[in-house]
A protein has these predicted regions:
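Extracellular/periplasmic solute-recognition and catalytic clefts
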Residues: 93-105, 115-171, 279, 283-284
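Append "and occasionally in soluble cytosolic enzymes with long acidic Gly/Pro-rich linkers
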Residues: 176-256, 260, 268, 335
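N-terminal lobe/hinge region of extracytoplasmic solute-binding protein
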Residues: 1-15
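A bilobed periplasmic-binding-protein/Venus flytrap-type ligand-binding module shared by bacterial periplasmic
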Residues: 105-108, 152-183, 187, 207-212, ...
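Ligand-binding "clamshell"
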Residues: 146-157, 279, 290-304, 360
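Extracytoplasmic/peripheral linker and loop segments enriched in polar/acidic and small residues
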Residues: 266-271, 294-359
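Short helix-initiation/N-cap motifs at beta->coil->alpha
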Residues: 116-127, 245-246, 267-275
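Gly/Pro-rich hinge or "lid" segments in bacterial periplasmic/extracellular proteins
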Residues: 2, 55, 61-116, 122-124
Length: 360
């Protein structure tokens, strides 16, 4: 999606994306009654110079051109005490171990109260609902056992801002071979989850490319790619698939499909991104802006999950984050998706369905 005005009514860049000037609204107040001014907004950027020439203007001076910057500063803004500018005010916050937020209490101007509780896993949230600790749970992926309860109302939504994806370790001896990566991709039935995904960019985005290669399931094609592998790779063809607990059943299904193509598969469960892996099945949060430099650029060693290195992709990502013209940016990201999908450093499966369960 596009960045839209909120606290800032308008913004501009006089030098092609190196300096960004934001003009704040003049009729906005914090929840304590204080007027919102440039001095009451603080961003902690280590490599950005911030000037506030008057109470309605903030100027950010970057070290390099960066067309994505408006989306970076579009996150929710609070002042000290978790005070915002909206209808609902945080009146209490409870923290657990490692500063994990356990509970928020919010009150609006009519004195209505909402209590939000947070759980580290989906299973713990579902248990809390069963025990009557909460009356509504949001954003769960596995609706069981509530689908057979008569005392609840269930709604579902396809979350197009997330994608279920298998990251392939392109530095692995076996997975460095493009033909093998494509064999894995062709072997999977990708229509058994939510809405079919073909790209790391959301279909809601202005940069989405609907014409990329789709890799519909084709076991015969997968076996052909495997037959073409060098003999030393075909010997004892075996692979590990790591996944998170919520996707375990999907991982087991994929394991059977890979084995049908002649690839012995071992499934492991991990609660975090493993440092060493061959294939990793996870749910990926798609950034609002199509810039995915952190995920696919070869220099991003801590966030490039597939350990992917491709000079053409690097150049497209570099160009996309400095280009200001929207149509030119769109062309760049259309090419980015086309070449990335062709090279198969990851397998995009579907946009997941999430459920909300409300006690009647």
């Amino acid at each position: 999606g596009n960045v839209t005005p909120n606290l800032a009514r308008s913004w501009e860049t006089p030098d092609k994306g190196k300096t960004w000037i934001f003009n704040l609204g003049q009729d906005i107040f914090w929840q304590d009654g204080e007027k919102l001014t440039s001095d009451s907004i603080n961003y902690q950027f280590s490599d950005v110079e911030v000037d506030k020439p008057d109470e309605h203007t903030i100027v950010f001076k970057l070290q390099e051109q960066f067309s994505v910057f408006p989306s970076i500063v579009s996150r929710p803004t609070f002042k000290k005490g978790l005070l915002g500018t909206g209808e609902w005010k945080v009146t209490n916050i409870s923290l657990g171990q490692a500063e994990f937020v356990q509970k928020l209490i919010l009150v609006n101007t009519k004195k209505d109260k909402q209590i939000y509780k947070f759980y580290p896993t989906e299973e713990q949230a579902k248990l809390a609902f069963k025990l009557g600790e909460v009356d509504e749970i949001q954003g769960i992926y596995n609706i069981k056992p509530f689908d057979i309860w008569s005392t609840v109302t269930i709604t579902e939504e396809v979350n197009k801002n997330r994608v279920v994806v298998i990251f392939l370790n392109t530095q692995d001896k076996l997975l460095s071979d493009k033909s093998f990566r494509q064999a894995l991709t062709y072997a999977i039935d990708k229509n058994s989850g939510g809405q079919r995904a073909i790209s790391p960019i959301s279909p809601n985005s202005w940069a989405y490319n609907p014409t990329v290669k789709t890799y519909d399931q084709d076991l015969e094609r997968a076996r052909e790619f495997i037959d073409e592998l060098p003999n030393e790779l075909k010997e004892n063809l075996s692979i590990n698939l790591v996944t998170t607990p919520v996707l375990l059943s999907l991982a087991e299904k994929i394991s059977k499909e890979w084995e049908s193509a002649g690839i012995e598969t071992h499934v492991q469960v991990s609660s975090s991104i493993p440092y060493e892996f061959q294939t990793f099945l996870a749910i990926f949060d798609i950034p609002t802006d199509p810039d995915q430099y952190a995920i696919w650029h070869s220099t991003q060693t801590s966030t490039n999950i597939s350990k992917y290195q491709n000079p053409r992709i690097d150049k497209l990502l570099e160009d996309g984050r400095v280009e200001l013209d929207l149509e030119e940016r769109r062309k760049i990201y259309l090419d980015f998706q086309r070449f990335l999908i062709e090279d198969s450093p990851a397998i995009f499966l579907y946009h997941p369905v999430t459920y909300t369960v409300i006690r009647n």
